[in-house]
Amino acid sequence: KKITTLLSSSTVAMESNWGDFIKSDDTYAEYSAWHYTNIEGGVTRQQFDSLALLQSRGALVYRVGYLIDELKANPNDTMKLKLLIHLVEDLHCPMHMGRPENRGGNSIKIRWFGKETNLHALWDEALIESQGLSYTEYADYLHRTHAAKPLLFDKKMIVDWAWGTYQVTERVYAATDKTVKSYNYIYEFKSVLDESLVRGANHLASVLND
């Protein structure tokens, strides 16, 4: 109820892309590095934990925790609430936990159903759009096929969530060559995509309910 009031006539779903929309406004340029954390492939969990919170790698993991603390201190900060909603989603997008040498997949060019794109855009947009469903239809499908499982939130969970995304990222990089066969790629990764979206939704609910 408190969140509904803060977002006025809007909803969590409607505001979830606000963090991307503001990228076109130079006023918000300082937030550009908040959307990702770049980590090399093949690191151990111990190495990952030491790297994930370094802002020099991109500030995504660090800033999720930062925004949670800020909103506890000032629960009425609508801008930070909208940023938090978006960044928790980014935390569950595989290529936002990508490798620095290819800018999270942005410089890996691929062909997708005959059109040129890149690995980052594939996982941000194209793979979802290839389902041929509206966002409402897709959300309804996920709601019907996956149980809501929000957890009692603990701030230590943030790095655990990031590590889970990193595991998916490793699989995505290992299968880059398979993108040329678009339908086969969808078949292989659809369940991975679904699980990532559901994890993100459950974890966002945990944060917002805290």
Where on the chain are the PLM-derived regions?
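N-terminal, motif-rich segments that launch catalysis or mediate targeting to/interaction with membranes
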Residues: 1-85, 99-210
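Histidine-centered catalytic micro-motifs
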Residues: 86-97
